[in-house]
Amino acid sequence: MLSRRIIPCLDVNAGRVVKGVRFQQLRDAGDPVACARAYDAQGADELIFLDITASSDERKIMHDVVAATAEQCFMPLTVGGGLRTVADIETMLKAGADKVSLNTAAIKNPQLIADAAERFGVQCIVVAIDAKREPDGQSWRVYTHGGRNPTELDAIAWARRAVELGAGEILLTSMDRDGTGDGYDLELTRGVSDAVSVPVIASGGAGTLQHLADVLDQGHASAVLAASIFHFGTYTIAQAKAFLGQRGVPVRS
């Protein structure tokens, strides 16, 4: 069985790492370069850097901050937020990113996924999906622009389509659970994981180490993303790996 990855996420707003609850009430969590250095030292498997207001502000991602973060980061780095063209993606890869995360732009122009995958390889292309449970409780709607704008897309159907177009990985965030510490949306994660043939990174809701184990087991996720529990010192990466390892989850040492 492939090792399960533990991935801290840097949500960056105006050059600072922030963390909110359900995409609101942002708290400052530090300098992105310092955070990247710390997570590298702690042994994180990968790092995700998301410029969370680049799409809603209709501006480019902060190249200099990404480049400085990549310099301190010797694990795989995924960068997302405000990437709209193949040229934007190339700029980020040249700045030091190993993978790029596409969200709003991929929904506006799904061909971008195919074009980027053809140019850089599917292993480079992560499609991020921000999903909120519908009132019927049985489905999840996709949102864009940092969770601000609802679409007509169903999360599971969109994940399937994104993979058909060339996504090599899905970054799946439950907007209902984001920052709550109440645990991941296991139903949503399992629904998407079982629908696609590529790895799914579960995001939104980690509050305890048991939550990580639950979404890997019951949610069928390939990797877990967490922010609050690592940024604010509740747990370390090493503690997370030890906890999972003791429960028979294969993790990288």
Swiss-Prot record:
Protein name stated in the entry: Imidazole glycerol phosphate synthase subunit HisF
Entry-linked NCBIfam families: hisF (TIGR00735), WbuZ (TIGR03572)
Quaternary context: Heterodimer of HisH and HisF.
UniProt xrefs under SUPFAM superfamilies: Ribulose-phoshate binding barrel
Compartment(s): Cytoplasm
Main localization, broad class: cytoplasm
Function: IGPS catalyzes the conversion of PRFAR and glutamine to IGP, AICAR and glutamate. The HisF subunit catalyzes the cyclization activity that produces IGP and AICAR from PRFAR using the ammonia provided by the HisH subunit.
Top-level division of the source organism's lineage: Bacteria
Reaction equations catalysed: 5-[(5-phospho-1-deoxy-D-ribulos-1-ylimino)methylamino]-1-(5-phospho-beta-D-ribosyl)imidazole-4-carboxamide + L-glutamine = D-erythro-1-(imidazol-4-yl)glycerol 3-phosphate + 5-amino-1-(5-phospho-beta-D-ribosyl)imidazole-4-carboxamide + L-glutamate + H(+)
Listed Pfam families: His_biosynth
Keywords assigned by UniProt, alphabetized: Amino-acid biosynthesis, Cytoplasm, Histidine biosynthesis, Lyase
InterPro entries, per the entry: Aldolase_TIM (IPR013785), Glycosyl_amidation-assoc_WbuZ (IPR020021), His_biosynth (IPR006062), HisF (IPR004651), IGPS_HisA/HisF (IPR050064), RibuloseP-bd_barrel (IPR011060)
GO biological process, one term: L-histidine biosynthetic process
Disulfide bonds: none
A single GO cellular-component term on record: cytoplasm
Record carries keyword Nucleotide-binding: no
CDD domains: HisF
